[in-house]
Amino acid sequence: MLDINLLRNDIEAVAARLAGRGYTLDTAAFNQLESERKSLQSRMQELQAKRNATSKQIGIAKGKGEDVSAILAEVATLGDELKAAEQAFDGVQGQLDAWLMSIPNLPHESVPVGKDENDNVEVRRVGVPRQFDFEVKDHVDVGAPLGLDFDTGAKLSGARFTVLKGDIARLHRAIAQFMLNTHTGSHGYQEHYTPYIVNDTALLGTGQLPKFADDMFKVTRGGDESAVPQYLISTSEVTLTNTVADTILQESELPKKMTAHSPCFRSEAGSYGRDTRGMIRQHQFDKVEMVRVEKPEHSYAALEEMVGHAENILKALELPYRVITLCTGDMGFGSAKTYDLEVWLPAQNTYREISSCSNCEAFQARRMKARYKDENGKNQLVHTLNGSGLAVGRTLVAILENYQNADGSVTVPTVLRPFMGKDRIGG
């Protein structure tokens, strides 16, 4: 959520920055609500002062032995008027809060201005794509004989679900274990195991709600539709980041570096017809997430470091990849700046996203009331960052395609062999 004072001080400047990411700020609506808020606030102060002054007259009148019934009636009337003004004020404030919740974050000044993914800027490429001396298969054809079972997934749950069996399932598990071991052992993150079901407050805090309700799986307890709504997590960013909600941290507790391996559940409501073949876009997929809670002055250095941590996984797996900076029009709702890491998929002859690392600055912290006490004892909002480290299923896809052999086998990347106990599967 944006700082409302930015809007009060220079709404046109905010509107211009938001326009860069394709969002039209309704300045007239804000100015109208803000005018009503100020008017009601003044009215409340006026009524409160008048009621206080009138109440004092009661004691004076009683001291003189005068009848106070008229004064009491006036105080009661003023009380009713004040209550009505307070209710009206709360209504306008609620509208302002809801309106603020729907506005995306402001892009950082270093973010390239652009409309969509075509305007993203490549930062670097690492690794050289392998040259094959046989016809390359995609991960579906490579994986099917090895235990990648889409038919059973569809039978059990419908489209965009997959069953992994045998060595494919072991490889999937090994990938996640390697990622967690690297982030906890080499990168300094603390491992967490968090719930897969959360309440709407948590999703409001990290920005998935209210804007992205259609992309969530809503669950009910015992089929009770009147119960407080709960949702399957779309990413463990939600749970990890919300561990600091409604919290005042000590400066010595920062930075907080957290990681978790979890399934992620997404309805993919806006993705009809996209990536219908294979594991690229699933309703359920695993991801190892990195979350950092930082002092504001350190958050952009932390973003670069987090990108490096995601890159280290790809480097260790010896998978070619590139890093891109997302333009203003392609960034996520809560992000001030985002880097995507894209891995090379030889069957598609292109790079595909495997990690997204974002600095949300104080956007989530303001929604969650996540603060720290600075050196002067003043409470300040923290900055929150999140990044995939990495998407496990897409990493499996990349390994199947980049490490495939002519005989149908797949070479196990060197760093995964201790987890697998073998150097290849299939064949």
Curated annotation (Swiss-Prot):
It is an enzyme of class 6 (ligase). GO terms for molecular function: ATP binding; serine-tRNA ligase activity. Its main location: cytoplasm. Its EC number is 6.1.1.11. GO terms for cellular component: cytoplasm. SUPFAM superfamilies: Class II aaRS and biotin synthetases (SSF55681), tRNA-binding arm (SSF46589). ATP binds at R266, S267, E268, E353, I354, S355, S356. Pathway: Aminoacyl-tRNA biosynthesis; selenocysteinyl-tRNA(Sec) biosynthesis; L-seryl-tRNA(Sec) from L-serine and tRNA(Sec): step 1/1. It is found in: Cytoplasm. InterPro entries: aa-tRNA-synt_IIb, aa-tRNA-synth_II, aa-tRNA-synth_II/BPL/LPL, Ser-tRNA-ligase_type_1, Ser-tRNA-synth_1_N, SerRS_1_N_sf, SerRS_core, tRNA-bd_arm. It catalyses: tRNA(Ser) + L-serine + ATP = L-seryl-tRNA(Ser) + AMP + diphosphate + H(+); tRNA(Sec) + L-serine + ATP = L-seryl-tRNA(Sec) + AMP + diphosphate + H(+). L-serine binds at T235, S236, E237, E289, S388. It comes from the Bacteria. Homodimer. The tRNA molecule binds across the dimer. Consists of two distinct domains, a catalytic core and a N-terminal extension that is involved in tRNA binding. This is Serine--tRNA ligase. It comes from Chromobacterium violaceum (strain ATCC 12472 / DSM 30191 / JCM 1249 / CCUG 213 / NBRC 12614 / NCIMB 9131 / NCTC 9757 / MK). The gene is serS.
